[in-house]
From Swiss-Prot:
Region (Disordered): 808-987
Bias (Basic and acidic residues) ranges: 808-859
Primary localisation category: cytoplasm
Domain PCI residues, every copy: 316-513
Comp. bias regions, Low complexity: 872-894
GO molecular function: mRNA binding; translation initiation factor activity
Protein name according to UniProt: Eukaryotic translation initiation factor 3 subunit A
Lineage start: Eukaryota, Viridiplantae, Streptophyta, Embryophyta, Tracheophyta
Coiled coil: 93-122, 556-742, 797-858
GO CC terms, sorted: cytosol; eukaryotic 43S preinitiation complex; eukaryotic 48S preinitiation complex; eukaryotic translation initiation factor 3 complex
Protein task: RNA-binding component of the eukaryotic translation initiation factor 3 (eIF-3) complex, which is involved in protein synthesis of a specialized repertoire of mRNAs and, together with other initiation factors, stimulates binding of mRNA and methionyl-tRNAi to the 40S ribosome. The eIF-3 complex specifically targets and initiates translation of a subset of mRNAs involved in cell proliferation.
Gene: TIF3A1
Statement: the UniProt record of this protein carries the keyword Cytoplasm: yes
Places the protein is found: Cytoplasm
Disulfide cross-links: none
Organism: Arabidopsis thaliana
Amino acid sequence: MANFAKPENALKRADELINVGQKQDALQALHDLITSKRYRAWQKPLEKIMFKYLDLCVDLKRGRFAKDGLIQYRIVCQQVNVSSLEEVIKHFLHLATDKAEQARSQADALEEALDVDDLEADRKPEDLQLSIVSGEKGKDRSDRELVTPWFKFLWETYRTVLEILRNNSKLEALYAMTAHKAFQFCKQYKRTTEFRRLCEIIRNHLANLNKYRDQRDRPDLSAPESLQLYLDTRFDQLKVATELGLWQEAFRSVEDIYGLMCMVKKTPKSSLLMVYYSKLTEIFWISSSHLYHAYAWFKLFSLQKNFNKNLSQKDLQLIASSVVLAALSIPPFDRAQSASHMELENEKERNLRMANLIGFNLEPKFEGKDMLSRSALLSELVSKGVLSCASQEVKDLFHVLEHEFHPLDLGSKIQPLLEKISKSGGKLSSAPSLPEVQLSQYVPSLEKLATLRLLQQVSKIYQTIRIESLSQLVPFFQFSEVEKISVDAVKNNFVAMKVDHMKGVVIFGNLGIESDGLRDHLAVFAESLSKVRAMLYPVPSKASKLAGVIPNLADTVEKEHKRLLARKSIIEKRKEDQERQQLEMEREEEQKRLKLQKLTEEAEQKRLAAELAERRKQRILREIEEKELEEAQALLEETEKRMKKGKKKPLLDGEKVTKQSVKERALTEQLKERQEMEKKLQKLAKTMDYLERAKREEAAPLIEAAYQRRLVEEREFYEREQQREVELSKERHESDLKEKNRLSRMLGNKEIFQAQVISRRQAEFDRIRTEREERISKIIREKKQERDIKRKQIYYLKIEEERIRKLQEEEEARKQEEAERLKKVEAERKANLDKAFEKQRQREIELEEKSRREREELLRGTNAPPARLAEPTVTPVGTTAPAAAAAAAGAPAAPYVPKWKRQTTEVSGPSAPTSSETDRRSNRGPPPGDDHWGSNRGAAQNTDRWTSNRERSGPPAEGGDRWGSGPRGSDDRRSTFGSSRPRPTQR
């Protein structure tokens, strides 16, 4: 492998090899450069190298080389310049397509040339033997050999590009474009096998995308752009599948689209949904699924009516007619199902899946056939107004088949309606996404439905009818067709009848007791036997028994009812227990099954991974060996050719041939050949120089002579052209003079007309200018008046705002003065109260001091009689403050007394406290603790407190003054109250 310092050198080397006809060597040189680890950063020359590389790959049909190169180039520019990769891939696809088109244009018999079932399959041995034996050398064979290889290469190109671009968020648009081109290739050349493989490839890519969610640069399907690209690709797939007639693949495409919609939980655009349901109608009609076909048409009608604003009334009527006819085409009976549980489950799963595809989300616990049925659809068409939008013929047909009873003339009523319907249809002008509507496709199904309705109605009025009469009632079919239809109806329990060809009659009614009629027959037979027995053996009278039973009947019924309720509850409980056990067993079995399945899957994945790794390893080793062997063979062949050409000695037979020895020998030979070639080229260049010099010497006089002849010819041509131009100029001048003379006589009229026009336009101009000036002056006056009015309004508003502002300021000042006055009054009141409290406190201190001195005198035990306390004088309330002030002034200073000790009432004060002061003092609670109860001082104070309380509570007791100075015993008790010391002896 040659190592190039710059990529441009490799490109130049490839061009040199191409010029000498060695395209394979040029391709190998570029391949070595692209796959080299030296050039892992993107450069602009690499893009040109890729263009040249792909040109060589296409010319030599080397798809594998192209794939390797594109993979390496994707690694190089994926994170740097994705647009370069897009250009390279587009160039590759363009080259392959052009080559295929060229081959196609060269083939005259295209149909025979393309008559190949599988592009990837080789020719059959039988075809090869036949061509050899028959000596086929004609044009068909040459066309096949010319066109088919290029189509095969183009198909491999599409596969390669899709494999390179798959599951990459940066290459989604290019992936979608490539898939679209591949679909168009399959569509254009009717490649059904390749189309199936292409669908499977795209399906596997999406499955791998969902499987490996941690992949780098993985597309995000929740993004609107990515989802739209994937949906567009699937819709292209669906369209091509229907156009190619691959209905099974079309149905799988529908499932792919539904899977995408479920995966991202987002509804596509209405235009895509219309295409989706239109293709569903075609698929279900081809598969004879008339029920789902009708529901798909109903969905399509709803979408067109709700989202297509340009839908004309004619198109709406045609779509509604299609919906109604599709619903009527559904067979009026359900197909009989087998009793196999597996088949029933499969049918239920199929119905559920079909309902989901159509857009009806059913619960798995409900049967799909119960939710999606002919009767439900017809009632919904009537309730949603679809029938009212249909044509009159369809409405009449609906009423005749579904609501009316005409057993004898049903065929004659329906036949003209079907003829009119078969002529209706056409392309929808306002709904281009929908296929062409042909109502005639429903006529056979409607004829079959009419036959079934006729048989059903005839069976209700006849028990036996002749075959000829029945054939006359059914104008659509021969009796053999009617018989086939009736067999299907009898099989599905729609009508009960039997055809007797020997008698030529048709018998209606329940004709046997087998199958489902056995149960009813036995019941009727048992009932008849019971009646006969009752007639033969009448029941004896039971009046006497009833007389004894009736009184206890209510209790018996109540007991029986309770017993039945208890039995019912027991049964329900047992059922619940059984169901719970069954659910538990099923849950355990499901867990075991899931666990076993998980283990099996893990083991299978490990085995597959090991096999894949082993296969990959073997494949790599095999490829390396094959590549080395091919290189050795190529080198050996090239060496042998050169030896033969140069008549050199070949390798000996006994000599060991290895790759290394062949390479060394080949390199030696190449070096020698290169030296010889350089010598030959030098000699050839010298010879060519001599020849070129001689040729130029001989050609010089000839060139000079030709130049002189050319000068003479040019001079003559110039003179002729000059003379012709002068003559033409003279002719034009003469014609202009004649034209001037002809027009000069009209000069006066022209001036008169000009003056008239100017005067008229001047007058009109003056009038318009005057009107304009008046209009402008009027506008100026109006604007001035408006400005004056606006100024006055602004002035008035300012004055009013100023007045309101002054009023507000005055009001605020007044409020502020009032608040200050109230504050001052409150302050004076508080000051007066404080003075009154201070005077009261001083008086209390004085009284307490006086009482203390008296107690001390009493405790000394002197013989002098105790000083009698002065009688308190009662002063009016209004004189409280002056008296308190006088007492405070005359009293000496005393120590501070706490507030809780200030509750005694002064006995020597000149006046009593006011009511407010009394309330305030009475609200004070007793002091905390028990100290004032255990001391002499506390005893005295408590005595005074009790005395004060008696004074407040009422007048003093008889025999003593109001201060309690009564008998001696009372004084003793009062003086010793609350004291722990012994009382002194009184004399």
